[in-house]
Amino acid sequence: MSAARAKVVPRRTVLTGGAAVALAAAHAAGAQAASFKALEQRLEGGRLGVFATNGKASLGHRADERFPMCSTFKALLAAQVLARVDAGQETLDRMIPYGPADMVAHAPVTGAHLDDGALSVETLCKAIVEVSDNPGANLLLKTVGGPEGFTVWLRSIGDATTRLDRWETELNEALPGDPRDTTTPRAMAKGYGRLFDGAVLSQSSRRRLEDWLVGATTGLQRLRKDLPDGWRAGDKTGSGARGSTNDVAVFWPPAGPRIYVASYITGTEVPMDVRNAVHAEVGRIARAELA
């Protein structure tokens, strides 16, 4: 018998080792669930929905429940416009005219340039992602066939869940149980994954979308708060009625795959700083568990 023969591991040892791994995984999942439930309790009756993934592992809480999207749809809208540019159906330098009749609340870019009477497609995309400009979103929605055209595009890239039914600012109504203008945390996080890991966008369009998300200023107190050294992040927030406060982020760790996190809150009256703190803790948990 050769001395180099591989050592035979007893079957009982293999089974015991496998059970230990399964037990550890179950314990970790239980700890995550407890953490998210504790965070949800801070909302005093509100709901928290979370899904985070690095493409291999994931974690979640109410991941398949519907939540009002509010402005988190705008990053996907910008991606749809970029996909049209990639397909030769749109150009970033095309000027889109608009006037006072197009104005709605929260217009940091379109309002500042109202006297100019037009802005480029690229400027509008940047505005809706970085500062969540509402008239800009409506102007771009018109170029893709409205909320229906946006939803049809989502179906074409594999999102069977997310739906947009109305325009800004009516889409932020957030009525309990209303399926209009909603998504699930799982659908949104996976949607971001398709944009950066799939074939939806060209490399140049992915870089442009990444720049806009990283340049966003509305979510610095949410998922991106207390970002560790060496990490990069971009996000798109959303806020609406009934305490609806959302954030969807992409994290780039110092090493390893991107992490996509969707965190949604609705049905609460706690102050904004409490809601932001819940999102910040979700971000911390996702980074700790998935990096």
Regions found by a protein language model. Name each.
Residues 103-140, 147:
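Conserved catalytic neighborhood of penicillin-recognizing serine enzymes
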Residues 43, 79-89, 100, 129-132, ...:
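Sec/Tat-exported extracytoplasmic proteins
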Residues 3-16, 32-39, 143, 147, ...:
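Structured C-terminal helix/loop/strand segments within mature extracytoplasmic catalytic/sensor domains
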Residues 29-68:
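Beta-lactamase-like hydrolase cores
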